[in-house]
Every structure is written in C-alpha cells, then in structure tokens.
C-alpha cells in the first residue's frame, strides 16, 4: 500500500512539474514578444498592436488555468498543508511587471457578491413599486370619499319635502329592481334545472340503448327473414334457409318444406302477378290481405 501511494505521489509531482514548465515557457514567450516590441523603447507600437494584446491575454488565461490545476493537485496531495502558488509574474524571468492574476476562488466570490447585489436591487425595486401602488390606492380612496361628500352636500341643499319624496321613490325603485332581479334569478335557476334534467334523461336513454346493444344475445342468431313465402304469398312461412338440391343452391322454407329452383321461383312470381291482375280486372271484392298487402289465394 505504501509503495502504491508513493507511485501516485510521484506521478502527481511529475504532473505539477510539467504544469510549472508550461507556465514558464508561456512567460518566456510573453517576455520575448514584449522585448521585440519594446527593444528600441517604442511604446506606441504596443498600443497599436491589438493582435499582440490578444495573444498575451490568451496566454494569461492559459496561465490561470495552469494555476488552478496546480492548486487542485496540491490540495489533493496535501489537503491540510496545501500551498497556493504565488503569482507566476513575480518570478525572476518577468521582473518589473504590475500584472496580477486573480485566483479562481476570488473570482467566484466576486460573482456571488454581484449576484447578491443584483438581488438586493431587485428587491428594492419591488418594494418601491409596492409603495407606489399603495399610494395610488390611497389616492383613489380619498377621491371616492370626496365625491361621496360632494353628493351628500348636494342632497342636503335640497328642501326637506323634496328630499323625503326622492328618498321614497328611490326606495320603491330599489325594491322593484330587487324583485325583478329575484324573479330573473329564479327563472334562470328553473331553466338550468330543467336543462340538467333533460340532459340527464337523454344520457340515461343513451346508456340504456348502449347497454341493450352491448348485451350478449342468447341462443342462435336469428336468420334474415325473406320477403314472403312463395307458396302462400305472405309472411306466414317466413323462415327460409339455403340448401343445395340437385347441385344447385335453392331456398327452402322451414315451415312448409317448399323448395324452389330459380326457374320455379320466377314462374310462381309471374302466376302471383297474373292472379292479382285478374282479381283487379274482375272488380271482385278483395277481403283477404296480410300485413304487407299481398293477396291470399288458393
């Protein structure tokens, strides 16, 4: 276990050394860039060279990142005796410089302070708005009171007879309005109750119909009824079924047992038509009709 911890610490030390080397290289590059511009004491070129300023800012950002990494590694190795690195610009490689690097923790604290200040400002603004609203409400109340006082003064100026007469009329009109409003409310309530009752009844009927339609049917399903029995010309034998006779699908009456081929069916229908025509032409009294109006014949 001790051997493993030693290897880990060695690895962390190597990574810290690499970070320090990278930081020193960046500082040397910045120093060389500045020496190129300030070698002859030409300070105006530095102000004009925006690209150089951007390059230096990017390298300073990278140095800040390396500082934060170094802090994290040192705290991880020695959480109790963690050493925060000093500003890299205070090294002998970069003397006489006023540039300072702000630690990330300080930057975070500054952000928190800014947020708190913003919240306080918002709260103050809300309080001011509430105060303004309260003032407006008070002003409105005062105006209403003044209007009421003016109305009362105008009524007191009238004669006592007129005042009494007007007060009676106002009382009667208010009673009539109250009665009318009460009647309207009662009518509206009755109409609403009637509508609700009608809707409930309709819903009940619909529910009953749905229940009937969904109710499972017992026994065999009923066969479709034919138009009429070809023997009697009525619905006295309504239960027909299909059956194959002599290799042909024919209609068979379950009641009388009559089965008809296609040709026989046509012949019977023609006979029925002719018999009905003959009866009508002979002006005979026709008394035997079934529910569908077909003539009963022998």
Swiss-Prot record:
The keyword Coiled coil applies. Residues 214-223 have a biased composition (Basic residues). Keywords: Coiled coil, Metal-binding, Zinc, Zinc-finger. A zinc finger (GATA-type) spans 229-256. Residues 4-37 form a coiled coil. Residues 203-212 have a biased composition (Basic and acidic residues). Residues 183-202 have a biased composition (Acidic residues). Gene3D superfamilies: Erythroid Transcription Factor GATA-1, subunit A. InterPro entries: Znf_GATA (IPR000679), Znf_NHR/GATA (IPR013088). One of its GO terms (biological process) is regulation of DNA-templated transcription. SUPFAM superfamilies: Glucocorticoid receptor-like (DNA-binding domain) (SSF57716). Residues 148-227 are annotated as: Disordered. One of its GO terms (molecular function) is zinc ion binding. SMART domains: ZnF_GATA. This is Putative GATA zinc finger domain-containing protein 25. It comes from Dictyostelium discoideum (Social amoeba). The gene is gtaY.
């Amino acid at each position: 276990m001790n051997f493993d911890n030693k290897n880990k610490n060695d690895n962390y030390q190597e990574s810290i050394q690499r970070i320090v080397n990278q930081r020193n290289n960046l500082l040397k590059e910045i120093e060389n860039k500045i020496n190129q511009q300030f070698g002859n004491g030409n300070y105006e070129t530095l102000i004009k060279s925006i690209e150089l300023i951007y390059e230096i800012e990017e390298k300073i950002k990278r140095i800040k990142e390396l500082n934060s990494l170094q802090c994290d590694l040192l705290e991880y190795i020695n959480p109790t005796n963690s050493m925060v690195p000093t500003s890299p610009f205070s090294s002998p490689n970069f003397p006489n410089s006023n540039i300072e690097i702000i630690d990330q923790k300080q930057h975070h604290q500054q952000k928190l302070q800014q947020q708190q200040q913003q919240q306080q400002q918002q709260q103050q603004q809300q309080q001011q708005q509430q105060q303004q609203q309260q003032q407006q409400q008070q002003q409105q109340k005062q105006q209403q009171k003044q209007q009421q006082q003016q109305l009362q003064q105008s009524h007191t100026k009238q004669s006592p007879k007129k005042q009494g007469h007007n007060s009676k009329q106002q009382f009667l009109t208010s009673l009539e309005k109250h009665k009318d409003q009460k009647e309207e409310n009662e009518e509206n309530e009755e109409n609403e109750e009637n509508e609700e009752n009608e809707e409930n009844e309709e819903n009940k009927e619909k529910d009953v119909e749905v229940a009937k339609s969904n109710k499972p049917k017992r026994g065999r399903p009923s066969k479709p009824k034919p138009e009429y029995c070809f023997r009697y010309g009525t619905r006295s034998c309504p239960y027909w079924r299909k059956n194959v006779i002599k290799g042909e699908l024919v209609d068979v009456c379950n009641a009388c047992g009559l089965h008809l081929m296609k040709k026989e069916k046509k012949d019977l229908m023609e006979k029925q038509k002719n018999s009905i025509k003959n009866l009508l032409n002979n002006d005979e009294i026709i008394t035997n009709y079934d529910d569908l109006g077909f003539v009963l014949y022998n």
